[in-house]
Amino acid sequence: MTRLLASLLLALGLLAGCSDGSDKSADPDPTPSASTTPPAPAKPAPRPKPGTCHSLSYDAAVAPTFDAKTVSCKAKHTAETFFVGTLDTVVDGHLVTVDSDRVQQQVSSACPRELAGFLGGSAEDLRLSMLSTVWFSPTVEQSDEGQDWFRCEVIAIGGPEELLLLDGPTKGVLGTDAGRATYGMCGTAKPGAKDFERVACARSHSWRAVGTVDVRPGKGGAYPGAEAASDAGQSTCEDTVRDLADDPLKFTWGYEWPNKKQWSAGQHYGFCWAPEA
């Protein structure tokens, strides 16, 4: 019982300690005692299992907790559970809450780490894809009941604030040409153009990200500034796209460098772009 609920019941006279105004000196009439069976405790939710699929909206996918119903992986779905781990909620001998920074940092580092091995391909393939991971943990109430799991979901970003339907199992998908073609990072126009939108290559597009360039950090690991980030990939991207072009003397290329917000989120590299015929 929560403190709020207990206070409400006391106010309504439904808990001991309330006075009903009757004469306490009179002998109360005997009343038959009723034997009641206490209700059975609620069954805890089952622990998630890897290999299950879910139909999530974009908003649900980025929420901290979500009570998702499992759907058949043969049906339409936007998320697949690829890893289930156990939360460590004890720090220096003391329990910490499931929504504490310490616990959430554990999950936010575990899921991206597990994703790379699950999807296959190279680190570059993952950078050049629209596949990502979101993670869920029990609510505070579920944690209090003893649930200590966290689950990692693989999703594909289809476009701005939109998830792409997953095309079959995703295990090892970036190790295949078909997987890289479906889930690759593409654009509706040249990066920097007014009508540019980043989309999965399964969607209509005219440009494709074909390489990445690491950007050297500034002092103390800080964002180096837009000028330095821009300069970092110009020649590399030009060479990358030249090697892919039908005519190495006549081709178009693009370079998209990280801004300060993207840098703070962990993207310390830029993208090389090439038009698609």
Language-model segments: what does each one mean?
Residues 1-10:
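N-terminal export and membrane-targeting signals
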Residues 11-12, 84:
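Intrinsically disordered, low-complexity regions
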Residues 14-17:
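C-terminal motif of bacterial Sec signal peptides marking the signal peptidase cleavage site
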Residues 20:
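Short, conserved catalytic or interaction motifs in soluble domains
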Residues 23, 27, 32-277:
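Long, compositionally biased stretches enriched for glycine and/or charged residues
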